[in-house]
From Swiss-Prot:
Cellular localization per UniProt: Cytoplasm, Nucleoid
Keywords: Cytoplasm, DNA recombination
Keyword check for Cytoplasm: yes
Organism: Shewanella putrefaciens (strain CN-32 / ATCC BAA-453)
GO cellular component: bacterial nucleoid; cytoplasm
Broad class of the protein's primary localization: cytoplasm
Protein name: Recombination-associated protein RdgC
Record family assignment: Belongs to the RdgC family.
GO MF entries: double-stranded DNA binding
Xref: Pfam families: RdgC (PF04381)
NCBIfam families named among the record's database cross-references: PRK00321.1-3, PRK00321.1-5
Length: 304
């Protein structure tokens, strides 16, 4: 349940919905496994996984939701070879070239015949709805997966006025300034990893890892006009993260010491531990968002 990435969105309008109403809305779009002829299925599932019993898990007006996606694995090369074999056979028997429309129909037939025997894979994506911040945090490093979750949530609710998080000034300008100054604003602390890019179309990319970012070798690249597009940070003593210029957060990791705060909870009740972990994570992510917005100079004004 602990989030590992953050793709960030904000509401254009206040999000007002009670847990029960949200649960009811999501119930019409619950996940069901692929049948023999389904190529994929997508829907809401228990927010807390197998141990959970509800599509929405809420605490302190913070709502956790989860989507599950199942996809049949049909290698393109297998389909291509089967199609070529079938086309060659028919063209040889009928002594003519098949039209594109006929080949497309054959391809559909081949896919249909392969689906019942195909392996499938499942993936889950969670999101944290924070009405107090008017934000949604999606636990995904993929903007596409985040948008898929939001699209289904929008379908369930009827509307979902959200936009990607954006700031008054480009994120890279702040990251570059922090690197020049040798420190990030408290409670953030720079670590030993960064990626710098030239703003020129044909410019280069330089990556530093496990290196003192205050060294002249690093700063020399700033003098040539490169800007920082990725920067490793610590948030207090609780979270390590990689902040990117698109305002997304990768490699989010809560420290063992922080997570140990709930070690005495739920030794005999796994659900109690999950509930406590959710409350702990939610509170710290809210604190992280407050600090991030402040450090990056505030959010861009939304247009009504």
């Amino acid at each position: 349940m602990w989030f590992k990435n953050l793709t960030l969105y904000r509401f254009n309008k206040p999000f007002v919905v009670e847990t029960e109403a949200l649960e009811t809305a999501l119930a019409d779009f619950t996940f069901s496994p692929c049948s023999s002829q389904d190529i994929s299925k997508f829907g809401f599932s228990n927010a807390l996984g197998k141990k959970g019993s509800s599509l929405v898990h809420s605490a302190n007006n913070r709502h956790l939701i989860c989507v599950t996606k199942e996809e049949k694995m049909l290698p393109g090369q297998v389909i291509k070879e089967a199609l070529e074999e079938k086309v060659a056979l028919i063209e040889d028997e009928e002594n003519r070239k098949l039209a594109k429309k006929e080949k497309d129909a054959l391809k559909d037939e081949i896919i249909t015949s392969l689906l019942p025997r195909a392996f499938s894979r499942r993936s889950q994506t969670r999101a944290l709805i924070l009405p107090e911040l008017e934000m949604i945090l999606v636990d995904s490093s993929s903007a596409t997966k985040a948008e898929e979750l939001l699209a289904l949530l929008r379908k369930a609710l009827g509307s979902l006025p959200v936009i990607p998080l954006s700031f008054k000034a480009p994120v890279e300008s702040h990251l570059t300034e922090w690197l020049k100054n040798g420190s990030a604003p408290l409670p953030f602390e720079m670590q030993d990893e960064a990626e710098l890019k030239s703003e020129a179309d044909e410019g280069g990319i330089v990556r530093f890892k496990q290196q003192d970012l205050k060294e002249d070798e690093v700063l020399a690249h700033l003098a040539t006009g490169k800007q920082v597009h990725k920067l490793a940070l610590h948030f207090g003593q609780s979270i390590a993260l990689l902040l990117q210029s698109d305002a997304s957060v990768k490699r989010l990791k809560f420290s063992e010491e922080f997570r140990a705060g709930n070690d005495e909870v739920g030794t005999d009740d796994p659900m109690a531990r999950l509930d406590a972990d959710f409350a702990l994570m939610g509170s710290e992510l809210v604190a992280l968002m407050h600090a991030l917005v402040s450090a990056l100079g505030g959010l861009e004004e939304t247009q009504d």
